[in-house]
Amino acid sequence: MADTIIPESLFEPSQLPTPTENLPAVIHDNPGQMLRSFLSSPFISASLPLKDIKKNVFRRKYNNITLSLASTSEKVPYGKYGRLLLTILTTHAVIGNPDDQEGNILVHYDSIRQLLKEMQLSAGRSNEIKEQLEYFSKSTFVFEERRTSVVQKSLFKDMIDVDDCYKKDKLEATLVSSGIIPFMEGMQYIELTEDGKKSNQFCITIKLSPAFVKFSKSHSVPINYSTYKAITSVVGKDIYAWLTYRNNGLGKGESVFIPAHSLVEQFMPVKEGSHENQERTNYYFIVNQIKEIKEKYYPELNISFNQDGMGVTLRKSVAQIEPDDSRYVLVTSNL
């Protein structure tokens, strides 16, 4: 594994921690405390793969957002542990202060076990988290968003040639925003070996890229990490984050109808060549996930299901979490 460790020149000597620097032995003193983390809204609309796709490229499109993941390794981040790690990395990007003028943020852990404690996971999940961490360290995402609105042609009078064929006074203008964003600029750790057997990783330093930091600070929203982690279904995690996000965007007395097809496209897209009833099957799986979330985790959720299976209506509900919600402690609070 030594040949995959980032060269020391990537980090200034002052940025590298000693094995016990700045990290407590216990991350959270109150295991019953609700924890708050952050997740960027594009990853709520178009999330990571649900499972291991065994490819190094993944593309997801939802409405006006297209998200493409690409990795120099054999796989991209995926599944429930990829999602948990993403919200941890995003939270550090949101609340952290850049360590240099370029905008990097360094995150230090004494060992993989301290990262697991921060994530509220048992030591038995170290292999899964190490695996996802490696995928993130070698992955970038391409984010494209298209926003269309109707504008007066006069707004572009200095840019439109007289012979251009725009006849009407009002035009459709689409703003296309895109960027290639690596999650990290590098990662460094020590692996101790005895008799040829690998042990856990120690002295982990993660260097979040300036682009990822800026993106996270601009687009992230708070989520209840305790609930997000407790939901065992990967699709359920995505649905819960989306319900929280959409509800927080509604005003008092407002509601929004989401067609069944849109729900399926967002959370469980149907592959080409699938059975003709697959979309209907996926929709009712999503409905059951929403019902379970309401029953177990979000009883205040005000949502109704169209009896003919055409979609769901979300009405403004009591917010589970607000920005800077005093009921919650940041998942990274003791780092």
PLM features per residue range, with description:
Residues 2-335:
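Charged, alpha-helix-forming regions
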